[in-house]
């Protein structure tokens, strides 16, 4: 009887296969050591494992045919079997590793730094970077005195990770800091943490708990996979004090993520105290300030002030303090804090140094140098997607949309997991009038984030701006289905109702949204939309009341400077309702209150008020300052506004032929989506004013075409209806003119008595009717 086991032993198959497995294991260990030591692609280890296992049948076949003592012939069947195994192995390896980098995990980059020195840097390739969302740790010590560490510990780890280009510790969309206080942050369940991590494009997320021990402090670190929501690793980490614990957690996390050991050993890794402060008295208010940034900027500023009083070398606290002082209308003091941060920038890792210099040049009125610094960062770190995002934001604000689009596309190409960049790409294509590319970007964004409302909101907003209101409504409705408790989809539905002139539906939607408000940011959006609805109806007094509520929230969320700017710009609303004295008083307050670098925007507010009062001379007097302001702020994206105001001054002086090119510049494709945004501070969009000038010049067909464009996108726009009435009257269509006026006056049925546009429409109707 045939004994297969004995035959295997006679042919020495177990010995040969065992030797192959042992040799393969040695090769695998050597490969793993080499990958870690020389920072090679981790895919190389997987490649060796796959090759090792796929060739096992060939080794077994050779052992069976040639393992027995004596000479053996090499058969045709054996050759075919070996060839088939080899072909199969090659095909499997090709399918598994096609497109994967099996070389070095880093690339060398040579650039010239700001001192003119040639610098060579080794930067990780995007494929091997890790994005980690860090959530607050739970205090299980039973000691309330340690509650502040719940938020602080996660933030300290995030700051420490900034030293390693292989790992990006990302925030949590400020959701943790929108309620509670610095010592009692929101502690989300794992399911909610997973959702937030996915929104932030983080492949993994980290949370945990800590407790006090006789020897110091101990934390249980939990690392989860975002896609599956499963626990990947759980570690116990301990240290003598909280900041040392943050260092230990950071190191443990890097190793668990698979950052090559050779890279870890060669990378500077300062203790997190060196990146922050040696003073415990400075650390606690600093972390409190970080927590308060999203909800109470004045409280945050006071916390950072306390931190720098305790340690003036605390560069990161100085940097935040500088930003907040500038936003608090304390420009000179803000620059001093930023300069103090630059003197002690040795406490910052390189990425933060670039951010500091960019902010310093932006605040000090040198926007071009800010862009230069941001561009230098992308040259030093050409594989750093976040650097390209920073550059893209600055370029977009400067008005260089093509360069901004290229920078965003570079960022997405470097890290395809950052799907949120697709919204920015879609917005830029939309503002350029490229509908096909815009929709392609938005739909890809939706495909990658099928569970969230944000992509649906993005597409709905696009269709809203392009006048496709049915499509906009459908996407806002879909967003509501995905997130029923989120007020933003309701805001979108209200906007659609206002665009269509359905004021009652808009009011009902606002009432529904009011019951859903969760955060101060939600409330700000609500009051701004409520103000737009009231302004559309000509209830400017109510609109001003909404603006005051929004301004109070803006002061809380963004600081006094932002609030004072909003308060000053509400002066144009006061002028529109016939209250010139209130408008002047608001401008006087703005002039007396705003400090550099914001004081120069007073000229813009004055011009907007003058436009409402038909004061062409004041507009023209303000124009040089406005154009200089836009250059100084690097705000090329708002250059159209200066053209619009100049065109308005020419129209008021009956110089319409000179105004036409300026109106065309102010209403071209790059700003169309903005113009159809129900920006009621403007009163009427440039296309309507452009049409008015064409009508005066007798170019009725062109005027009609422009007004048709406006009303096809915003059917409920009463200003355009009034201008269309004037056009029809000029063409002898009295009945058509009266019908358009009736539609506008129906919108303004409850307008304030002093509301000037409604009064002018009534006067025109009386004239035509008689």
What residues fall within each predicted segment?
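Canonical tetratricopeptide repeat
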Residues: 320, 354-356, 390, 424, ...
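Short beta-strand->alpha-helix linker/helix-N-cap micro-motif
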Residues: 111-220, 224-240, 269-275
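TPR alpha-solenoid repeat register
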Residues: 317, 351, 387, 421, ...
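C-terminal/domain-edge helix-coil "capping" segments
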Residues: 67, 92-126, 227-306, 310-311
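Membrane-embedded alpha-helical segments of integral membrane proteins
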Residues: 13-76
